[in-house]
Amino acid sequence: RVTVRELVKAGKNLQIGTLSDLQGHCEIGDYVRFHSNVHIGQKSKIGNFVWIFPYVVLTNDPHPPSENLLGVTVEDYAAIATMSVILPGATIAEGCLIGAHSTVKGLTEPHCIYVGSPAKNVGSTSKIKLPDGTSAYPWTQHFKRGYPEDITQNW
């Protein structure tokens, strides 16, 4: 079961995992991947080629319960690891990696790694290496599965 509420605007090739919940009034870009048990709060704005892994929650109410909802923004090519919580009004910058079990508030810097609760910037994503020694990020340099060739040839 997946719940997609009213006024969700989604781009091309959105993939939604089992038991995910997309609240209304959200904007979602092209080629976004939501794994299982993801919660996207109202007023969230998610860019293109974003990965959100299991049990991630994008919150939206800074003083619950209230009518003053602040959506989360996730920019292009960001990845949010399992069980992370993104607090109301936060912005995950382009190419950011949010580590598992992290709690993010405020603004992040592009292409940086954030871990912990509260999440802290621990450096550039370029310092993460694959087993062969090449950079794991940006992930578009080595991962193309499930994307059309006309898209990946421009990476």
Regions found by a protein language model. Name each.
Residues 54-61, 129-132, 136:
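Short glycine/proline- and charge-enriched loop/turn segments
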Residues 1, 5-6, 11-12, 16-18, ...:
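Left-handed beta-helix
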Residues 62-64, 90, 124-126:
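Conserved catalytic-core motifs of eukaryotic protein kinase domains, centered on the activation segment
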Residues 110-135:
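Conserved beta-strand-loop-alpha-helix hinge in the C-terminal portion
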Residues 132-155:
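Acidic/histidine-enriched, glycine/proline-rich intrinsically disordered or flexible terminal extensions
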